[in-house]
Amino acid sequence: MKECLENVRRKAPLVHNITNYVTVNDVANVILAIGASPIMADDREEVEEITSLCEGLNINIGTLNQRTIEAMHLAGKKANALQHKILLDPVGAGASALRTKTALSLMEEVHFDVIRGNVSEVKALALGSQSTKGVDADAADVVREENLQKMLFFAKKYAQSFGTILAITGAIDLVTDGEKAYVIRNGCQEMSRITGTGCQLSGLISAFLAANPENALEAVAAATCAMGLAGEIGKGRLLEGEGNATYRNRIIDAISLMTGEELEKGAKYEIR
């Protein structure tokens, strides 16, 4: 994991993000904090050109409209042609027909190296389930110690079915390519009270992927550990009278200051 982080800092990859309007600034700042460079371009007239300049692509369906849907398809196909690493964040899949249809359509036309979402979003894509609570996972879908084996089986099965690395994030994170799985226990409950920590993680994963294309599974796991560890560190640095807004900044600060050694020491994971 140390090497994955150090590669991001050394290579400083340019990551193209077609993301949502709610969290776009935080996504850009997290990518900068880890040592990569973000660009946010979503007009159909330039997305293919911008994608050509970058090493990675992060597609997030959080705030959809017909213009950005077209841009996502164009950018995704261009990135595939260039053999760039691509991540799909199917925000709110299962919450509306448009979101589910858009995510499935993208998956049909574009090969994604990583799909990152909560359990409810992934179930919506895999099973047609509609248990998503807005953009959050339904309580019934949370990965817990008591259902961990069942969820690991589900994650591995659909990573193989989708032909991708699947990152299911929540209280316990699962990262798998269908064969090998990382069970990650970094992070804290307070992170769920801040808008966009999932979107930030998708940006972070995209940066790690772009810098570690030959070691994709470990790169995704390392980014996931880094985000959770930053949440833990940020929480520990909060002072009396500081709340959500400060905590968001503390997380970004922790990412910007994180060393490879700190990540290696603080990462909490097991391989199944």
Give the residues covered by each predicted segment:
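Glycine-rich phosphate/adenosyl-contacting loop at the front of the ribokinase-like
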Residues: M1-M40
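Active-site cofactor/substrate anionic-group-binding motifs, chiefly glycine-
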Residues: V30, I34-Q83, L88
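Short, small-residue-enriched loops and turns at beta-alpha junctions
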Residues: L64-R67, G92-S96, L174, M191
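Glycine/small-residue-rich loop that forms an oxyanion/phosphate-binding "nest" at active or ligand-binding sites
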Residues: T68-G117
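Conserved phosphate/ATP/ADP-binding segment of small-molecule kinases
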Residues: T100-A181
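Short pre-catalytic strand/loop immediately N-terminal to key active-site residues, enriched for Gly-Thr
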Residues: R185-T195
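Conserved post-catalytic alpha-helical subdomain immediately downstream of the catalytic base
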Residues: T195, I205-Y247
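Charged C-terminal helix
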Residues: L229-R272
